[in-house]
Amino acid sequence: MVDNSKNNTETLLCCSFCEKNQKEVKKLIAGLSAYICDECIKLCNNILEEENNNLSSYYDVKKKIPTPYEIFKHLDNYIIGQLHTKKVLSVAVYNHYKRLNHLNSKKNNNIELGKSNLLLIGPTGCGKTLLAETLAKFLDVPFSISDATTLTEAGYVGEDVENIIQRLLQKCNYNIKKAETGIIYIDEIDKISRKSENPSITRDVSGEGVQQALLKLIEGTLASVPMQGGRKHPQQEFLKVDTSKILFICGGAFLGLNKIIEKRTKLGTKIGFNAKVNKNLKICSKDALMQQVIPEDLIKFGLIPEFIGRLPILTILHELDKKMLVKILSEPKNALIKQYQTLFKLEDVELKICTKVIEYIAQKAMNQNTGARGLRSIIEMLLLDTMYRLPSMTNIKTIIIDESTIVNNNLTPILIYKKHDSKTTSGK
């Protein structure tokens, strides 16, 4: 007796890829000597679609390069002052993406264009990070920020330099082609200066060692980046990323660099009883001294010559004065005052902050030496009680923060009710 069920199973056709039989799938398409099911076709389509999207996003970024003037005007909408730095960044970024076009062009005439990474030097809160962030948003390219203080030489406790690339990959969902058109900002770069000007017999794993490790990465190499981040080990998978197409912007405050510059500029002056007094010698401000920086000063500070060579474009950001801080508070598109006014608008309340109060906030930030970074915390403290009580209050039309609000730390604003009668909060 023949077992029919057994014969039926044997005659079933199977997908050559997933090995599911024709009863387990909706459709089975036959080829010359193979079969493919509808599920495998769908999977293949998804893979091809994803690759096409990756390529299209890469080439879209590649083709649309704003002119230096357009980049400058956009930066001008969000950052107050720093005109020279904005001009330097605009030209450098335009040339960088023009270089990427040249690399991918069929008309490439075998002339290799070098990469020009940037070094931004300026005090804390002067806009170094904001400049890089605004650039990346405008160009619609992947952007990541890394802190140089966490980096150590390979084999020591801390982060490997490849983690910098890994952060960029995370920002673009591990799309390697897109990551290779990105911008990486390395903050606190001055903190990896070597501990002394002379080479030491002991290893400087978080200073000169990190600089040496960053050399090839910044210049351009095929970096092996661990998929899951962390330390490298032989068993894990690596992603290959060409860093020659990534623009690196390094920034730092370089505290004490002005003293090195001052010492260099006064070297020609003799001292002693018989020395002639140079009447033309002017006492320069710290800001003016920083504008005179040369690569030799950075070497004395602790950066190795090879590292400075990888950052050919150097620009100095000015220290922010009170007038600039007042403008930062109110003029840019995303100015802090406008942000808080929008926040209050969500409660259907208009917020008005008088000029004297804005000047007070700017002066307080100056006294704290925090630059523009300290402005938000000052405003938060100023509006804390008001923001605490406002959601529980009704019928409020306008809140006015005037000079009387800040006198003797009396943080009680003027409230204008919708019934058109002016009152002041009781402070309860």
From Swiss-Prot:
Gene Ontology terms describing biological process: cell division; proteolysis involved in protein catabolic process
The keyword Hydrolase appears for this protein: no
UniProt binding sites for Zn(2+): 15, 18, 37, 40
Protein origin, superkingdom: Bacteria
Record-listed ATP binding positions: 123-130
Gene Ontology MF term list: ATP binding; ATP hydrolysis activity; ATP-dependent protein folding chaperone; protein dimerization activity; unfolded protein binding; zinc ion binding
InterPro entries: AAA+_ATPase, ATP-dep_Clp_protease_ClpX, ATPase_AAA_core, Clp_ATPase_C, Clp_protease_ATP-bd_su_ClpX, ClpX_bact, P-loop_NTPase, Znf_CppX_C4
Organism lineage string: Bacteria, Pseudomonadati, Pseudomonadota, Gammaproteobacteria, Enterobacterales
Entry-linked Pfam families: AAA_2 (PF07724), ClpB_D2-small (PF10431), zf-C4_ClpX (PF06689)
Function noted in UniProt: ATP-dependent specificity component of the Clp protease. It directs the protease to specific substrates. Can perform chaperone functions in the absence of ClpP.
A GO-annotated cellular component: HslUV protease complex
Keyword annotations of the record: ATP-binding, Chaperone, Metal-binding, Nucleotide-binding, Zinc
Record organism: Buchnera aphidicola subsp. Baizongia pistaciae (strain Bp)
The ClpX-type ZB domain, residue ranges: 1-56
Homology family: Belongs to the ClpX chaperone family.
SUPFAM superfamilies associated with the record: Glucocorticoid receptor-like (DNA-binding domain) (SSF57716), P-loop containing nucleoside triphosphate hydrolases (SSF52540)
Subunit relationships: Component of the ClpX-ClpP complex. Forms a hexameric ring that, in the presence of ATP, binds to fourteen ClpP subunits assembled into a disk-like structure with a central cavity, resembling the structure of eukaryotic proteasomes.
Protein name listed in UniProt: ATP-dependent Clp protease ATP-binding subunit ClpX
